[in-house]
Each structure stands twice: as C-alpha cells, then as structure tokens.
Amino acid sequence: MLRRFINYCYETHFLTGHLHSNSNIVFNDHQMEHNTAAVCGIWWHADVCIDGTPQGYGGYEVDGNQVKWYYKSAGHPKDYQFRSYAAGTSKEFPKDIIANVWNWDKNWKVEWLENGKVMGT
C-alpha cells in the first residue's frame, strides 16, 4: 500500500550515473531516472562518453515540485545540446543526416528543417 501511495502521489526524480552515457527514463507519470554522463568522458581517454555525449555534468533546478534539468558540456555554452553530421559522413548510413542529441527526453521535439520547412523528425 505504501509503495502504491509513493508511486502515484509523489513526483520523484532519481539521479544516477557511472555509465558514461546520458539517458532519461520515464517509469510512469510520477517517476523518472536521470542517468548523467561522466565529467571524465571515457576515463579521460576521450573527450566524449560512449554515447557521444561530451564531457560535462548535469544541472538540476528545483522550484517547489517543479524540476528542470540540462546537461552542461565542458567548454561549451549551456544550450549546446547536440552535434549533427552531414549526409555522407557515415559509411553505414551514407544518405542520412545524423544528429546526436544528448540528455534527450520524451517531451523534446527534434526536427530537421531546410529553408524553414520541416524535412524530418
């Protein structure tokens, strides 16, 4: 009974790490896990983590019961949240434009525009 009460009456955000990658996992409308990439990248051997996330840290802002979060890449401004690669960059997907968006969550909308027209999501 207590578990049911906690699961549905309180909004909880679990902060985890150590995987050297970024992910946000929504368990239900009230529970979310934020797994934050490592500031050391891949153990200081590379300036990116295993998922392409740059070295950096997670930021969390709490105001009452509202939680906002972002990922701050080392050496970049706070709004630096993705890298894109032109078609032909990948041998496996030569016709595709590739976007690596870190700290993404299900509420984000990521679109590709050309001359103001949405070309893909």
Specify the residue positions occupied by each region the protein language model found.
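Conserved beta-sheet core of the metallophosphoesterase superfamily
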Residues: L2-S90, K109, V118-G120
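Short edge beta-strand/loop segments characteristic of extracellular beta-sandwich folds
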Residues: K95-W104
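Solvent-exposed loop/turn segments flanking beta-strands in beta-repeat/beta-sandwich domains
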Residues: D105-E114
